[in-house]
Amino acid sequence: KAKNCLIFGGSGQIGRHLIRKLTKNNYKVTVVTRNLHQKGYAIKTQANAGYIDIVEANIFDEIKIRKLFSKTDICINLIGILYEGKKGNTFKNIHSIFPSILAKLCKEYKVQQFIHLSALGINNAIDSDYAKSKLEGEANIKKNFSLATILRPSVVYSVDDKFTTSFMTLLNRLPVFPLYYNGNTKFAPIHCSDLTDIIYHVISKNLHSKIIECVGPEDISLKEILKKLLQLINKNRILIPLPFFVANLTAKVFQLLPNPLLTEDQLKLLKYDNILSKKYQSNSDIGMPSLRIFKEEVEKYCYMWREGGQFSTKKYNKS
């Protein structure tokens, strides 16, 4: 019998990858989205007919959400925000209160598995509201549904991301690019396909009650990441370290934008490395190492940011 997966946050890069993976392996998927007309078609195209159902609902409409749990075997929460917005999109609501609601429903309806996507590095970043809300969410989940498995990925990248693609767009346009904290913050970028494989492994092996840190094969500083991206798109740019007071001032200005490039809270996060803490199991420990090399993967789609785009004939300097 095919198992039924209920996914929250299915329209993002991780959600779309996961829907394809699950439906190819005969799982039936129900995806909750707040805007059916805006996101429904993009989600629907990720799977064959009959394997996916899309429900339009506000995630805090508990009456509507509750009805979906009666036939749910596996609940997956991929919802997260990087900055606070309007209409109740606060860190506390999205990262703390909503996961708590899901955990209680999972317990009430005896759901077999609850998989929650958190974030790496949150234990150290105690001065960040983002990190505090993520930790609160994890605590609420463990309190209400002890069988839940929590995944903590480092930065996730792919052609559909808002990480490498945003950086390459900015590096294309700006002659000078700022380095916060001298660009020394380390990340362990994990490809979206690898993270999807890890989630599928947790489901198929029926893993419970774990916190798993999910990382790629390399620890790379932000400065190194920017240099690799510049090399891939054949650009020379000046990378300038910013004093903290200047960085904080730019964050104050940027966070006034509808889609801020940087906020004060994100600046706090950048003080801390986003790599394995070694306090919890890693994806390698559960037999799912990520082998995709950052530069090799980005090379597959970076041509869109080179001069000439897909028709670019100039090869980048691999040295």
Regions found by a protein language model. Give the residues of each.
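Conserved Rossmann-fold NAD(P)-dependent oxidoreductase catalytic core, especially the SDR/UDP-sugar
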Residues: 28-30, 81-82, 88-144, 149-154
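Substrate-binding strand-loop-helix patch
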Residues: 184-193, 212-232, 241-252, 289-293
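A hydrophobic C-terminal alpha-helical subdomain
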Residues: 245-319
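Flexible, glycine-rich beta-alpha linker
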Residues: 126-129, 149-170, 185-186, 220
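NAD(P)H-binding glycine-rich loop region in Rossmannoid oxidoreductase-like domains
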Residues: 37-41, 45-101, 105-108, 120-124
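N-terminal Rossmann NAD(P)H-binding glycine-rich loop of SDR-like oxidoreductase domains
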Residues: 2-31
